[in-house]
Amino acid sequence: MVLSRRFAQVSSDEEDDVPITRSKGRNSASPEESLGKRRKRKTVKLYEDFEEKEADRKKKRKGNKEDEDMAEGDDDQAEEETNPEAEEEEDEEEEEKPDDACPVGDSVNVTGKGKGKRTHFNQFAYDGNTYDLEVPVLLVPEDKSQKPYVAIIKDITQTKDGSMMILGQWFYRPEEAEKRGGGNWQSSDTRELFYSFHRDEVPAESVMHRCVVYFVPAHKQLPKRKNNPGFIVRKVYDTVEKKLWKLTDKDYEDSKQREIDVLVKKTMNVLGDLPDLESEDMLVDQENVLKAKRSFRKVNISPVDVRREEDASLKAETPGSGAGISSEHYAILEKFDSLTGDAHRDKCLGKLLEAVQHICYIPENKQAGDEAKVGSDASHLEQDEKDTKPENGKDEKFLWPDAAVPQVCALENASHASLASDFQKYNQKMRTLVFNLKNTALLARRLLNGELEPATILNMSPTELKEGLTADETTKKEPDDADRMQMTSVRCSRCSQLTVGLRDIIQAGHGDRYQLECVDCGYSWYASRDEVSTLTIVTDKPAQGTEKEDIEKNLTSPRETNKPKDEALKTNDSNADNNPEASKKPE
């Protein structure tokens, strides 16, 4: 375009005329020559300009290429510099947080006030999923290098500012469960988690997704991983004591035990009846349970068989007698065909016979060769008879050994029937009976005469055995309150009965105070010394048909015990004059 525009300008007539007139003044050459030279110069100049332009264009093209190359390099470098930002933007776009968690359904409860107000729900929605209570879920860990946390949703709440929170009951992975002495608890299965009663509150947005957790008892086989994928729980982790317990242990608190039972039942409903472990596995498991429980449960020591020690130390006095039984008592039991065949039971029978022998009557004409002869300590037994024999002489009806053997055998049979399964309790009961029958003559007499049945004696407390009386009999023998109190002639202000007695005399302050109590209605009140200075003490009940005798008795204060008798009587008379109502007799 430039080139064509220049040729057009040179070929115009106006351009030709102007340079001619100017050249005439400077050159003397002819117009034709000058015109030819000028055209030639212009042509050369135009070609030179054209070549320069072409060269400039080539240079510009080269420069443009270099600039483009440099620009491309700069662009690449700029792209390299801007790539991290672009990647971060892309990551941010990929990690764009979903909508906040929101409750589902109506609220079920509201707790707290003010800033601490919480609204409770049964469900919440987050990231397109709905989560309910009692559902195990995976939670985002604090550190990305950690595995997701596992918890059961126990509560769903919404704070006053609208934030959703969940209360989770946590599971512990074996590498997270610390031991008290250091280190972590180990597991033989990578699926295993440890259940705990530790709870904590976290934002609802930390929930990743649901998961499956199976609670398998210790005596059941684990479900196959292929058929039932998910976590398994066989033990409970104590976050305080840093110990592990079995799911099947029954030492938890009632509420915690019910919680575990419900979780195990849910698992059994899903998996069905799992097969039991083999016997070897069960033995190993029981050993582990015993080792773990030694630290917190009282060790149950098996009862010691005392028979071995006692039977070994005691020798039979005769070749045919039982171990630990004297020849006399063995012969008596053999005569009455009362031997049981059990050495220990026969020994207990012999001791019971010996315990009641001191109240039995042994005829004087008994010969040394009789089966029921008295042993070497006969003189001692006779002395005991004299000491314990009652005044009415009823001991003579307890002939030895006829009156003793049937009752003693019945008592031992009743003890063995009720305590045969527990040798320790049976042995203790026999020792208690032998001791009390020896030291309480009333108990022995009531056993032999049939007043107390063997079953009744077995159920008597140590105090009752010592007294020889049951609780009902002891209550009947206790005197009434009226028998223990001094009855007065004062009339009760509540029931208007003349059954008021003096319960107590209280010494306090300036004078004595007397506590009066009505036997009929139980009403109690206090009276001053002046009011009760002269009281009527009711004597023993008279015979039927005779009038009651009233005796006036002057009650003196404990402070006046040291005063002369005349002075004390004078004081009481003056008090009676001042208070005539107190000295009145009932009509």
UniProtKB/Swiss-Prot annotation:
Keyword terms, alphabetized: Nucleus, Repressor, Transcription, Transcription regulation
Identify the stretch annotated as signal peptide in this record.
none
Upon changing residue 170 to L, the result is: Lost binding to methylated histone H3 lysine 27 (H3K27me3, H3K27me2 and H3K27me1) and accelerated flowering time under long-day conditions
User: Which residues does the annotated region (Disordered) include?
Assistant: 1-118, 371-396, 539-587
Q: Which residues bear the site annotation Histone H3 lysine 27 trimethylation (H3K27me3) binding?
A: 140, 142, 149, 170, 172, 198, 200, 240
Q: Where in the cell is it found?
A: Nucleus
Question: In which domain of life is the source organism classified?
Answer: Eukaryota
User: What positions does the domain TFIIS central occupy?
Assistant: 344-493
Q: Does this entry carry the keyword Hydrolase?
A: no
Could you tell me what this protein does? Transcriptional repressor. Together with PHD finger-containing proteins (e.g. PHD1, PAIPP2/PHD2, AIPP2/PHD3, PHD4, PHD5 and PHD6), cooperates to form a BAH-PHD bivalent histone reader complex able to read histone H3 lysine 27 trimethylation (H3K27me3) and low-methylated H3K4 histone marks in order to regulate transcription, especially to prevent early flowering; H3K27me3 reader of this complex.
Quaternary structure, from the entry: Interacts with MOM1. Component of the ASI1-AIPP1-EDM2 (AAE) RNA regulatory complex composed of at least AIPP1/EDM3, ASI1 and EDM2 and may contain CPL2, AIPP2 and AIPP3/BDT1. Part of the BAH-PHD bivalent histone reader complex that contains AIPP2, PAIPP2 and AIPP3/BDT1; the BAH-PHD module associates with CPL2 to form the BAH-PHD-CPL2 complex (BPC) for transcriptional repression. Binds directly to CPL2, PHD1, PAIPP2/PHD2, AIPP2/PHD3, PHD4, PHD5 and PHD6.
According to UniProt, the name of this protein is ASI1-immunoprecipitated protein 3
Species of the source: Arabidopsis thaliana (Mouse-ear cress)
